């Protein structure tokens, strides 16, 4: 039952991150289709100096991609549990699955931060407030979407290795208990 649940969670993680990737790419397309202002006309009507209009579609898809990415990241971290190595001694005793779990956890956070921040910059650039008007608006959604895909793969690998490490820790604890009982 645990292995079936683990497989299901991994599939959900990957599918949700693929969906976030698609949303990021669609947001990039919607942003590129947004009408551009002619600089001279726009500068007469507004002091902001923005050369393009924000895209409502890109904004909505960017928000949806960020929400989905956040939910997947929280889900994987809660279900995967807290996997850590505190000392050199812990590292020497750690199984391969535990070392992999820690490595994938770190990579998962890196992918999350990069994808979330690039999606956020792209989304804010398409908000009605135009606070990020001076930033170049190209490729933020695409980069965020690509990193969402990487996040899905790395986070799924983290979840699988964390569950395997927990199972190994539980089996090792049972064997130690049996060994201690037989000595007594």
Swiss-Prot record:
GO terms for cellular component: endoplasmic reticulum membrane. Keywords: Developmental protein, Endoplasmic reticulum, Glycoprotein, Membrane, Signal, Transmembrane, Transmembrane helix. It comes from Arabidopsis thaliana (Mouse-ear cress). Glycans are attached at residue 180. The lineage of its organism: Eukaryota, Viridiplantae, Streptophyta, Embryophyta, Tracheophyta. Involved, partially redundantly with VCC/DEAL1 and DEAL2, to ensure bilateral symmetry development and early leaf margin patterning, probably via the regulation of auxin and CUC2 distribution. It comes from the Eukaryota. The chain crosses the membrane at residues 62-82, 99-119, 140-160. This is Protein DESIGUAL 3. Belongs to the DESIGUAL family. InterPro entries: DEAL/Modifying_wall_lignin1/2 (IPR009606), DESIGUAL (IPR052222).
């Amino acid at each position: 039952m645990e292995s079936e649940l683990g497989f299901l969670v991994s599939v959900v993680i990957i599918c949700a991150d693929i969906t976030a990737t698609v949303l990021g790419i669609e947001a990039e397309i919607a942003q590129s289709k947004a009408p551009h202002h002619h600089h001279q006309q726009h500068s007469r009507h507004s002091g902001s100096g923005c050369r393009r209009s924000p895209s409502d579609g890109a904004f909505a898809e960017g928000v949806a991609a960020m929400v989905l990415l956040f939910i997947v990241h929280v889900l994987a971290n809660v279900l995967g549990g807290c996997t850590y190595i505190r000392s050199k001694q812990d590292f020497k005793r750690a199984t391969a699955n535990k070392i992999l779990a820690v490595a994938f956890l770190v990579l998962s956070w890196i992918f999350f931060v990069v994808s979330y921040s690039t999606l956020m910059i792209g989304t804010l650039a398409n908000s009605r407030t135009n606070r990020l008007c001076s930033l170049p608006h190209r490729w933020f959604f695409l980069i965020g979407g690509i990193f969402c895909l990487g996040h899905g793969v790395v986070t799924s690998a983290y979840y699988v290795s964390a569950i395997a490490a927990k199972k190994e820790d539980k089996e090792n604890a049972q064997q130690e208990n049996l060994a201690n009982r037989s000595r007594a």
